[in-house]
Amino acid sequence: MIRVDDVRIKSLKPLISPAELKEMFPVTEEISGHVASSRSKIEDIISGRDNRLLALVGPCSIHDIEAGLDYARRLKKLSDEISDRIFVVMRIYFEKPRTRLGWRGLILDPYLDGSYDIEEGLKRARSFLSDVAKMKLPAGSEMLDPIIPQYIADLTCWAAIG
């Protein structure tokens, strides 16, 4: 019989499990407290119990980790200065769902070269979110499927469903 299924698959590589990745970049009690507190503040703002403005601020998507961390440090400083009026959440998107040609995002193509090392992309994304959480800056991201949130949702304070 002539093979007709999966004829264009070059190779298979199982992904790291969410539990394994979380072991590599664990959430401390301090970080989980920050995430829970930030989620509660966002809920209060959306429901009208907190009169501050909620602002999700950041680049289209993260591609340069160092530039992203520099941005986060600057945003944290500004956030602290305006926290009585505006609750700032850093927009940290790792995927580009509406991009069909070109770079698809840090998780899918962390090296920006078409290599699609998704495991490395997941590691970079979780590490980045962990670093931002350590700054006590709330993070917001877009969730496009039921898989990726298993790796990063515990470090995310706000989510868009894409």
Language-model-detected regions and their locations in the chain:
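Short, basic, glycine/proline-bearing loop/turn elements
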Residues: 28-29, 60, 112-115
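Active-site-facing alpha/beta catalytic cores
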Residues: 1-5, 85-162
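N- or domain-start disorder-to-order transition segments that initiate the globular core
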Residues: 8-47
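Solvent-exposed alpha-helices and their adjacent loops that cap or buttress functional pockets
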Residues: 47-49, 132-133
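Hydrophobic, well-ordered secondary-structure segments
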Residues: 45-46, 67-70, 76, 106-111
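N-terminal beta-rich core of secreted/periplasmic extracellular enzymes
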Residues: 31-42, 76-89, 95, 125, ...
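Glycine-rich anion/phosphate-binding loops
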Residues: 62-82, 115-127
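Short glycine-rich or small-residue beta-strand-to-loop segments that form or flank ligand, phosphate
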Residues: 52-64, 89-93
